[in-house]
């Protein structure tokens, strides 16, 4: 019997896959548990439409990330901090502080976990920080740390 998997089934198939499985296995387990649906013409058309919609949504997500990247790369985020002699900061600037500064000055809200910083910023001046907006889109934000 041909079935469309509605959920991942270990050793049998992944969600959205169409496979031939034994009739008894399909009727007694997959269909009863709601793990699969019988592959009829209408359900195949529904599956195709769903796949097209998911691809369209994914493409739109990448486009939005690219637009945000262009916006972010034009910006300079100003962060003020207390510093000692030689331009060393008392403490450091973390991704959370950068996100807060962006929210205040540019009204752009990002998740602090998207910032890829090896270490926190510990000196005055300009620093480039990478932001992973999407698995395929990475932006660079210019952060200017000035004395308070």
From Swiss-Prot:
InterPro entries: Ribosomal_bL9 (IPR000244), Ribosomal_bL9/RNase_H1_N (IPR009027), Ribosomal_bL9_bac/chp (IPR020594), Ribosomal_bL9_C (IPR020069), Ribosomal_bL9_C_sf (IPR036791), Ribosomal_bL9_N (IPR020070), Ribosomal_bL9_N_sf (IPR036935)
Gene Ontology terms describing biological process: translation
Keywords on record: Ribonucleoprotein, Ribosomal protein, RNA-binding, rRNA-binding
Domain of life: Bacteria
One annotated Gene Ontology cellular component of this protein: ribonucleoprotein complex
Entry annotated with the keyword Glycoprotein: no
One Pfam family from the record: Ribosomal_L9_C
One Gene Ontology molecular-function label: rRNA binding
Disulfide bonds listed in the record: none
NCBIfam families: L9
Protein task: Binds to the 23S rRNA.
PANTHER family, per database record: 50S RIBOSOMAL PROTEIN L9
Family statement drawn from the similarity comment of this UniProt entry: Belongs to the bacterial ribosomal protein bL9 family.
Official protein name in the record: Large ribosomal subunit protein bL9
